Amino acid sequence: MIVGLIIALIVYAALVFYIGWSGYRGFGVKNKVFLIAYSIILGLLSISFILGRVVGGSTILTIIGNYWLAFFSLSLMILPVVQLIMLILRFTRLDRNKTRVTATILTLVILLSVLGYGSYLAYTPTVNSYSIKINKEYKQDLNVVMFSDMHFGYLSGAKHAERLVQEVNALKPDLIIIPGDIIDDDLDIVQEKDIFSILSGLEAPLGVYGSLGNHDRYRGNMDELITAIESSNMDILYDEGMIVDEGIVLIGRKDHSEGVRMETSELTAQFDEQLPIILLDHQPYQYAEAEAAGVDLVVSGHTHYGQIMPGNLITGALFENDWGYLQKGALHTIVSSGYGFWGPPIRIGSQSEIVQIHIDFDN
């Protein structure tokens, strides 16, 4: 593990040097003071994300570190393209130095513009709607609102939570379900920002229910974390289920990352299979098992739909359904791209979302 960490740090340092050297050469400023200042700033930026995660407790460091991570990732995608264009332009009569400086400035403008637009997509959720039919009886159609991956913490804070409550309540849901990653690893900062008090404003006649994800962690035991989250009037289903309104079965699984958890069939066996069954499972795995266990609808998150492209190509390869709706036999599956974000508050090729699900029954 130590060897792997050392190799990762060496590779990271080499990539930072590549970005830094490209920028330094591009600006064409041959000045010792500029070089020293440039190197110090680049060095501090390059360790800001690591320090923010390891040290913690600093909002400014966390913000800088996460935006640096986005800048770093986008630079690695854009710089090779720019340098290929510059190589081709060498065979023209254009002034090489002027072309290099112009290209560097344009690259920086493009990077900052993409970061700005990506931040807008991260903080401006859209509402995506689906209509499904479950061939079981229930007394009425349901308007269900689902959202996941809020990652409440330093960057997904009180204002983001307030907007969530406002937009969800405007949809007038009968039922609200939240399949995990409610917080971003740090319960203390969420409590400091009074997020759970804000979430208590969510309104649905049949209640608000959630399961936990891989980022819903706490230094204490899980009971303490669940108690804290449930102070928002949300019921957490932790490898357990319940009957809502005498006619709908809701089941929440432990996250896949916990390793040991009950099988879906063990959870559904506790209920009448004639009742509609909705499963909250943070990571979109084991659809065949869910269908065999009599589940009618699985809602998940986790993938963020890649968050920053081409990450969506990776999630598409890893998950059978990495975003949106997929039907497998009688099983309906819906995966959200998430309301929040992990790491940089940036989305490129995806957008933060709230999901509205209209369910029609044999009523």
Which residues fall in each region the model found?
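Short N-terminal secondary-structure initiator segments
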Residues: 1-4, 117-130, 189-196, 221
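Soluble catalytic domains of enzymes that build or remodel membrane lipids, polysaccharides, and related
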Residues: 133-363
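Non-catalytic terminal accessory segments
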Residues: 1-123
